[in-house]
A protein has these predicted regions:
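Conserved N-terminal structural module of periplasmic/extracytoplasmic solute-binding proteins
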Residues: 3-14, 23-116, 132, 348
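Extracytoplasmic/periplasmic substrate-recognition and gating elements
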Residues: 174, 259, 301-366
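Short helix-initiation/N-cap motifs at beta->coil->alpha
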Residues: 81-90, 109, 181-188, 264-279
Length: 366
């Protein structure tokens, strides 16, 4: 048996994580498949130890990685772990140099270009042969496809980038049994909350990605619908200059600039800061991703049982002039597990990489 050496490069705390889970353990045991490969296998991801504290999704991902590692003692699993923002920069640099890790997180927007450059292994047949294939929501594959080919394993159970977390007791006092389904009603409620010195909805865009990922991704769909999105990613005519998408931008500008719904410092604070406004009671609601949801859930469960028992969840409210799915949300993940195309030259190593990808996105993580 080869002596294993672990190299964990942890840089800063991550700002997002795959999936949502309130448990800090694998949902099912990792499949201990017999693998012929004996050697090093590298994975690059952004689930830092700091991020895993209070984030069930991040903690679960790390737990499954550790379980897979322990189940395969002849394989040295080398983890290169960076913060989310650092990860995006580093993975782009490695792609430009043609030196991607064996296994890594693929962002949907990079799929087509990197596939055309021959950097990504076509996983279509491997995914179809996966023991978990029938359990996948086929829509999760869309951002990671080029034509009919699939280049990433999405998590079996997707999270959401856009969830409203609200204090049911506070909204009850404002006259609402549930969180409003329209922005018009949210704006009306803000009059009450402002009189109480409470922020209606906390939001943080300090990282300059939250407004797009956690808000516009869902708001835009309320105006454009799913067909426009598919046309955009397939480059079949849809454009960000289309009237219906411009209408979504106009509504977003109105909500953040012309109303008093959100905290005034939304563009200066991060999602981590904004969710603390909700936790402390300074805000009656918060909008963020499933990673924020799991952090809030865990924090309140430990420190404030009353507020924890009053947690409510809702989808993004519907704008008055939007005509598409009023209850839609941004389901799925911004990343999938991808494999370096170079591994095709080493069948045993490739089999190990496929096994790893299947397990860290399958039932053990879901």
């Amino acid at each position: 048996m080869r002596t294993r050496t672990k190299r964990i490069v942890a840089l800063l705390a991550g700002t997002a994580m795959l999936g949502s889970s309130f448990a800090s353990f694998a949902a099912t045991d990792v499949a201990a498949n017999d693998l012929a490969y004996k050697g090093e296998l590298e994975i690059m991801h952004y689930s830092t130890s700091e991020e895993s504290e209070g984030n069930g999704g991040s903690d679960g991902f790390r737990t499954v990685l550790q379980a897979w590692d322990e189940a395969h003692p002849d394989i040295t699993l080398t983890q290169n772990v960076l913060a989310n923002a650092e990860y995006k920069t580093q993975i782009a640099t490695l792609a430009a140099a043609g030196d991607l890790p064996d296994v890594f997180l693929l962002q949907g927007m990079n799929t087509k270009d990197w596939a055309k450059q021959g950097l990504l292994l076509d996983l279509t047949d491997y995914i179809k042969e996966s023991p978990y294939y029938d359990e996948y929501d086929q829509n999760y594959f869309t951002p990671f496809k080029d034509g009919d080919s699939v280049y990433g394993y999405p998590a079996l159970t997707g999270g959401t980038c856009t969830v409203v977390v609200y204090d049911k007791a506070m909204w009850k006092e404002a006259g609402y049994d549930t969180f409003p389904s329209t922005w018009e009603d949210v704006e009306k409620a803000s009059e009450y909350f402002n009189e109480q010195g409470v922020t209606t909805v906390a939001f943080g865009n300090g990282g300059k990605w939250q407004a797009n990922s956690d808000f516009l991704s869902t708001l835009g769909n309320r105006y454009t619908g799913p067909d426009w999105f598919l046309s955009l990613i397939n480059k079949e005519g849809a454009a960000f200059t289309d009237d219906k998408f411009v209408a979504a931008l106009t509504e977003m500008q109105h909500l953040f600039q012309d109303t008093q719904i959100f905290n005034e410092d939304f563009n200066a604070v991060t999602n981590e800061d904004a969710r603390e406004y909700y936790i402390s009671g300074e805000a009656a609601a918060f909008i963020g991703g499933n990673w924020d949801e799991s952090y809030i859930w865990a924090t309140l469960k430990e420190n404030d049982s009353d507020k924890w028992n009053n947690m409510g969840f809702a989808v993004l409210p519907q704008p008055a002039d939007a005509t598409e799915a009023p209850t839609s949300q941004n389901i799925g993940l911004g990343y999938a597990i991808a494999i370096n195309a170079k591994l095709a030259d080493d069948p045993d190593k490739l089999a190990a990489a496929i096994d790893l990808a299947q397990e860290i996105t399958g039932p053990a993580f879901a």
